[in-house]
Amino acid sequence: MSMKRRIAVTLPASPFVKDSVERVRWAEANGYTDAWFGDGGAPDALTTAAALGGVAESVRIGVAVTPVYTRTPAVLAATANALAQILPGRFVMGLGSSSQTMMNGWHGVALEKPVTRVCETALLVRSMLAGEKSNFDGKTLRSHGYRQFPLESPPPIYLAALRPKMIEMAAEVGDGVIFNLWPKRALPRMMEHVKIGAERAGKSWRDIEIVNRAMVMVTDDKADARNRFRAAFAPYYATPVYNQFLAWAGYSDAAETIAAGWAEKDRGKTAGAMSDEMVDEIAILGDEDECRSRILADAEGGIHTHIIAPLAIGNSEETERTFAAFAGGRFHLG
């Protein structure tokens, strides 16, 4: 039995919780199956997810992803327990390592041993959700004596991953794997590492859901859309996590130039390292048919759930056009 293909709106919709509530209402009325949060700052994703309990009647709510360094496993397990009760059968806990900018800069927390930390967090949270009393001494975490009431149907735990070691661990330990900001040429290699991790755990890779946050802009002006993507995401690729991933994905020269430009505080050099071809490999830009075709191609490549994340920041008309292109009456994943 093949895994269901799903289409999601991205959340939060704005700095105001009420806008996320309205986006979910719109998504349900327009054939979307899911709504997935990013979890970086305000409004808090997990709190807002709880606010959707009285609103979301059918869509699945996910978080892609909560950084494992900002909450202890016991806090994550307690939060997931509550959200699973509020959204029974329709909540996915997404965990990941985040980036140096967010952890070191925003939170003052060292991003150390990310593969091990994500793995140990996932294992601990899963055991806590099952009601097991904690007795864990790991390389990055320890917990003793914590126990919470078990759920009959605990929420699945999905793990964010970019490069081989993290992808393999995520497929081995997680119930699903979350991708982000990858060039399309890298997808076959990424899927090979999903298969390796699944085999290590004795699982079929076909049973592991692959979620992707797709940066999309339905537009008649590709040049403008490319420049928006460069302005928004060149700084991402300057961080060590994404810079190393970009080099691994086949853009080592661009990665080197981006890092150098960022170190020199030269935003023009940083953004200019991203060629049109490279931007088109990562972002999904163009008219409705072009954007739909790329999502369908990604589905054929192994992506099950596509989070539509419009690039049209601050422009409600462009955002609405992008979301409308994937509404149920106009788009079908098959």
Residue ranges with predicted function:
Residues 1-334:
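Active-site-adjacent structural elements that line small-molecule/cofactor binding pockets in enzymes
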